[in-house]
Amino acid sequence: ELLKQSDTLDMRTELGDRAMDTNDLEKERGITILAKNTAVKVGDKQINILDTPGHADFGGEVERIMGMVDGVLLVVDAFEGTMPQTRFVLKKAFEQNLTPIVVVNKVDRPGARPTEVVDEVLDLFIELGADEDQLEFPVIFASAMNGTSSLDADLATQEHTMKPIFDTVFETIPAPEDNSDEPLQFQVSLLDYNDFVGRIGIGRVFRGKIKVGDNVTVMKLDGTTQNFRVTKLFGFIGLDRVEINEAIAGDLIAVSGMEEISVGETVVEPSH
């Protein structure tokens, strides 16, 4: 719904209920297994979104994603309340000192108990050792199915807009530091493969900038280094991966040109 209501997609684009679950097993089981990333445009701003698995069985994916983001939207069912996977993901977010926003979804569901669910979330925050700032988490009440949201638990206040979520993200979650003038640091958190460009490293530019044609160095997990030339860069917008010429600190991108690259490895300038 965030994709639909942002300034990102063509109005004719048809989205299913689980637009970011593209893996066959995900579609079959109705769960997220592999982390996905996208970005939405809201006015002149951009929000990078990473959809992460919630289940502890896919913990490696969750931990890698938590290292790429500045905050989390914790989505909790207004009827079911907190689940085992809620605890798992939240614990990982707190370990990274991330800023939380709670979204109580499905408030239109029969038997929904949004106010009680917020109390459950607060209890869980306390149990997991949230600090004072994290305990002051903002709450949005929503129905993704209906495309509505509100800052009030009263169902009558729901309006057909995701603006409360967008506004809360901008107000609550810090923007990336502007350190594009520093030496490059790009960390690979996810991998992909394309028959045309080979192995692709996906991750976040933490410092500096990277351009197509740059000669860069991979700091390997075994302590060795390997040089390569950046052949292509891709950014993410909506459901598309788009070619770009340059990326700067804060961007989530995909990089090709590396024959061998592994999750957790870092790309830097050769001089550093």
Which positions does each model-derived feature cover?
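Short acidic, glycine/serine/threonine-rich loops at helix termini
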Residues: 1, 60-62, 84-87, 111-116, ...
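P-loop NTPase switch module centered on the Walker A-proximal segment
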Residues: 1-76, 80, 120, 191-194
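Conserved nucleotide-binding/hydrolysis micro-motifs of P-loop NTPases
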Residues: 3, 55-56, 79-82, 106-112, ...
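Active-site phosphate-binding and catalytic loops of NTP-dependent enzymes
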Residues: 7-35, 58, 124-137, 170-184, ...
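Residue-level signature of catalytic and energy-coupling elements of molecular machines
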Residues: 30, 49-51, 65, 73, ...
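Conserved C-terminal guanine-recognition region of P-loop GTPase G domains, centered on the G4
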Residues: 66, 71-134
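Canonical P-loop GTPase G-domain recognition
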Residues: 99, 108-174
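Conserved nucleotide-binding/hydrolysis modules and their immediate coupling elements
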Residues: 185-272
